[in-house]
């Protein structure tokens, strides 16, 4: 979903649906690979947790070797599809994300609560894959859409980790809520990051990615999530944490839907303009990096040699 939003917001007025479809397929393959590597490495810990004990690996319904082989095949397929149909930058982002998720985020989970920040980085990459598939560059717009996803994951996951703090403890995972019995630090983190979502989302309007309607909706949604986080800070109960979690689930699809519906011309400050006029002409089609060179006004390109 987030890859598609990043691509649509960055796309020309005439969305290249074939490029979008291949980008979604390649990103899905990469994401599935990362998830499989994660479950392979955590299969023994997953068996100790009520939430994950029924997964195929802990239940031994499938062996580690075929899972490893399929994960490798999906990682390669995702990389190949994205290189072929989207470009080197989205392919590098997606494949790098698989490596970070499997080789950094997963091993950090039993060691430090900072693993959540690394996981949030991984969650921020898919919309950047979509963006770069359409633009061919990691310009400011890519960082804005990625930044929104990064910040959103923090209150979302803190609420989830609070609800399953005992389960995470049984699995030996070092999550902040599992090491914060009072919940005070967890609640403060949720409130701070929820409030940060308001200016973070407004950057999309300032960069020309979306319009005033989006800015208004983003502000209201951010304040709603912040209010629920404040309620959790005042009464640190599972019921309040569940409300934050549910509101965060509502927040993201609504925000992304409004961003797509109210997408605006990308600001020149973002480094590329995708839905308006570039150097005096309309843009439609592949990224500028793959486009034929523009001729100055009044001139025509020389005829090709026979």
Give residue ranges: language-model regions.
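Interfacial loop-to-transmembrane junctions
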Residues: 182-185, 226-254
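Juxtamembrane boundary at the C-terminal end of a transmembrane helix
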Residues: 257-281, 303
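Intramembrane alpha-helical segments
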Residues: 64-134
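Acidic (Asp/Glu-rich) catalytic motifs at the cytosolic membrane interface
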Residues: 31-58, 155, 165
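Membrane-embedded alpha-helical segments that form the functional core of polytopic membrane enzymes
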Residues: 1, 8-43, 80, 88, ...
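Hydrophobic alpha-helical transmembrane segments in multi-pass integral membrane proteins
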Residues: 128-138, 197-204, 251-268
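Multi-pass membrane catalytic core of lipid/isoprenoid biosynthesis enzymes
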Residues: 43, 50-91, 181-205
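Transmembrane alpha-helical segments that form the membrane-embedded catalytic/substrate-channel core
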Residues: 29-36, 99-107, 147-165, 198, ...
């Amino acid at each position: 979903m987030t890859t598609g939003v990043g691509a649509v917001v960055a796309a020309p007025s005439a969305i290249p649906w074939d490029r979008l479809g291949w980008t979604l397929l390649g990103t899905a393959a990469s994401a599935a690979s990362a998830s499989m590597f994660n479950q392979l490495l955590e299969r023994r810990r997953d068996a100790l947790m009520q939430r994950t004990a029924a997964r195929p690996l802990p239940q031994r319904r499938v062996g580690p070797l075929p899972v490893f082989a399929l994960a490798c095949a999906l990682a390669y397929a995702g990389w190949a599809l994205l290189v072929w149909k989207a470009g080197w930058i989205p392919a590098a982002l997606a494949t790098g994300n698989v490596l970070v998720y499997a080789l950094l985020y997963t091993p950090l989970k039993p060691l430090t609560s900072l693993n959540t920040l690394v996981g949030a980085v991984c969650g921020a990459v898919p919309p950047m894959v979509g963006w770069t598939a359409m633009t061919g560059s990691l310009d400011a717009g890519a960082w804005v859409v990625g930044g929104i996803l990064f910040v959103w994951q923090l209150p979302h996951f803190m609420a989830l980790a609070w609800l399953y703090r005992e389960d995470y403890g049984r699995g030996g995972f070092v999550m902040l809520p599992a090491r914060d019995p009072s919940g005070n630090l967890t609640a403060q983190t949720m409130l701070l990051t929820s409030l940060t979502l308001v200016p973070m989302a407004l950057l999309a309007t300032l960069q020309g990615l979306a319009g005033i309607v989006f800015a208004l909706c983003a502000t209201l949604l951010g304040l709603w999530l912040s209010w629920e986080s404040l309620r959790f800070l005042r009464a640190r109960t599972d019921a309040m944490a569940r409300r934050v979690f549910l509101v965060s689930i509502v927040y993201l699809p609504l925000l992304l839907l409004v961003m797509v519906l109210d997408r605006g011309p990308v600001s020149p400050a973002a480094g590329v303009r995708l839905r308006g006029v570039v150097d005096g002409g309309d843009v439609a089609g592949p990224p500028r990096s793959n486009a034929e060179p523009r001729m100055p006004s009044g001139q025509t390109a020389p005829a090709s040699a026979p």
